[in-house]
């Protein structure tokens, strides 16, 4: 079966939120190991609610923001948010995820190629995506590189207990 892309609809919310939580739980476990529980809870205590709030505002009324879902065998298995900056002509691949049980099937590639094509149609002359430099984000970095992202500005987030 082929992965199909379509616009996000309100009835996709619960499934997309579950994909988001399932896909990002390993990242947050690593964050907690790295930061320690005390700082992790200060920074990320409500990470699931933050995703729920963000996704609950989709589809966005802002024409610069589009959200699409990936369907495989009739099931929503991924999603991608794109943001077009008409001023800079730079498009962004924003929040996105593939359900863990559907990863490594080419769905991410399909989503990113779709997103890049859509951004180009909307006037983008360049595109960017942000991801973590930690080991939990290594698959995401590989996926972005596989669709042609080839320049990166490293960034670090430092924390300390006060």
What are these regions (language model features)?
Residues 3, 7-14, 18-94, 99, ...:
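Acetyl-CoA-dependent GNAT
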Residues 90, 126-128:
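Structural preference for beta-strand elements that scaffold enzyme active sites
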Residues 103, 128-140, 159-162:
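Conserved beta-strand-loop-alpha-helix junction that forms the acyl-donor binding cleft
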């Amino acid at each position: 079966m082929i992965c199909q892309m379509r616009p996000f609809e309100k009835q996709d919310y619960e499934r997309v939120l579950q994909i988001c939580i399932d896909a990002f739980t390993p990242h947050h476990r690593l964050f907690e190991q790295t930061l320690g529980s005390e700082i992790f809870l200060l920074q990320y205590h409500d990470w699931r609610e933050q995703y729920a709030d963000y996704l609950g505002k989709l589809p966005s009324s802002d024409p610069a923001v589009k959200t699409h879902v990936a369907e495989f065998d009739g099931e929503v298995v991924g999603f991608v948010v794109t943001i077009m900056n008409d001023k800079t002509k730079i498009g962004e691949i924003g929040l996105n995820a593939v359900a863990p049980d559907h990863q490594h099937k080419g769905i991410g590639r399909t989503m990113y190629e779709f997103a890049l094509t859509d951004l180009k149609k909307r006037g983008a002359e360049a595109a960017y995506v942000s991801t973590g430099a930690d080991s939990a984000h290594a698959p995401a970095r590989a996926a972005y590189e596989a669709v042609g992202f080839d320049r990166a500005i490293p960034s670090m987030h430092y924390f300390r207990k006060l």
